[in-house]
Amino acid sequence: MKAFPVICLGFAIFSSSICVNINILQQIGYIKQQVWQLSYYSQSSSSYVVVKLLPNIQPTDNSCEFKSVTQYNKTLSNLLLPIAENINNIASPSPGSRRHKRFAGIAIGIAALGVATAAQVTAAVSLVQAQTNARAIAAMKNSIQATNRAVFEVKEGTQQLAIAVQAIQDHINTIMNTQLNNMSCQILDNQLATSLGLYLTELTTVFQPQLINPALSPISIQALRSLLGSMTPAVVQATLSTSISAAEILSAGLMEGQIVSVLLDEMQMIVKINIPTIVTQSNALVIDFHSISSFINNQESIIQLPDRILEIGNEQWRYPAKNCKLTRHHIFCQYNEAERLSLETKLCLAGNISACVFSPIAGSYMRRFVALDGTIVANCRSLTCLCKSPSYPIYQPDHHAVTTIDLTSCQTLSLDGLDFSIVSLSNITYAENLTISLSQTINTQPIDISTELSKVNASLQNAVKYIKESNHQLQSVSVSSKIGAIIVAALVLSILSIIISLLFCCWAYIATKEIRRINFKTNHINTISSSVDDLIRY
């Protein structure tokens, strides 16, 4: 068993340059899935491909007359005539008409274009520009018409490379011409009719958009493949200086073609192919990861790391690749889409679990397992893992975030009723107990809208209920408060009345006593006065 603990080649302790530790990341539910070689491309040049759709037939000793060729020629003429007329209408506006417009000094028939987008007008401009290469096209036409070779290169004064392809001629050269003198004319005619009929059917199928308007419809991958036939690898290698296979270049759609001319007399089609310039960055890898849920601190969580990263040497970036074209082994981009990663994210990628961030699962539909090179990595605490061969349940300990199931532990695995056959051994040579603090789990996942809305609605209903109860209580408290206020006021008034009465009584008592005292003094004075008067009289 092999172990792949890291992807990059070095480790910088005192810098932010850190390697990706595949082993540790897999143990917390972050699994490497696909690695692409990063290449950049741009549409920088073009080439013309002359396709001869009617093969040359060598003369035979018995001078066979092939009716199939005549019929094929007639059918093909009917097929190509609309394309030729359409191209002529776009490239050559009517002599007496002013209904045309100039783009970069080129006259284009607007009536032939109809309603067109900017990209379609650009394609029409390209088509008209191709007409200026009439001398080169004529040279290619004359060169290919007399030859039986499947690929022929013609260079004119402009030094533009043109590759003449004869897909049917390649079939005629290898099969038909070697048997011309050994078979009867009828047999040869039947075989030739079969080959031509199949090829015509294929052309009719893949060129259907071009029959409508070739200037506004680029040639599809299937059409290019049909035009080039078995010579596709040779054409790609002759026009592109790259070691990338022709299949990947065509599948990525990097080669775009457009019909620029149809020569009905010679049954030839001239296609302009935009040739990209491809540059491969040898030390740049784009890596795809799949995140599955893991069992962290007694709850289902998922790690917060980018799904795709770019690694150049021992540096990592987030790499969305939104405008890139992916094939089996390569990713083609027109520019670098790299985004910086924080130091904590890089440390987490390096296997420093204490720097990783997890978020609890908010919804029920979560990826809980993934296939990895013939093995299964699953969160067996959140789904049922049952081995059927041999038959036993698979238990995931608390200190394991996920479980890796390979051929040594199970041959037929059932995950919540889904059966899988395990065919490989795991390349992980060790597993360690993971310790993750509670502070590393934060809510960063998008919420489950339906669940949260139901909670909000329930909270609102409860709030309305509580508000009604509160209003009722407030009303009760208000009435009670009024009654209490009246009682208090009555008591206060009564007390004040009693106090006032007491004060009045005290004042009356004091006043009465004072009046009596005054009266007593007055009577005493009167008595004295009377006594004095009596003394005076005596």
From Swiss-Prot:
Q: What is known of its domains?
A: The 2 coiled coil regions form a stable six-helix bundle.
What are the cysteine partners in each disulfide bond? C324-C333, C348-C356, C380-C385, C387-C410
| The protein, known as | Fusion glycoprotein F0
**One GO CC annotation, please?**
host cell plasma membrane
Indicate the family of this protein. Answer: Belongs to the paramyxoviruses fusion glycoprotein family.
> What gene codes for this chain?
F
According to UniProt, where does the site described as Cleavage lie?
R102, F103
Positions bearing carbohydrate: N56, N73, N182, N352, N427, N433, N457
Q: How does it assemble?
A: Homotrimer; disulfide-linked F1-F2. Interacts with host LAMP1; LAMP2 and LAMP3; these interactions promote the cleavage of the viral fusion protein F.
State the organism named in the record: Mumps virus (strain Kilham)
Q: Which Pfam families match?
A: Fusion_gly
Per the record's keyword annotation, is Coiled coil included, yes or no?
A: yes
Origin organism lineage? Viruses, Riboviria, Orthornavirae, Negarnaviricota, Haploviricotina
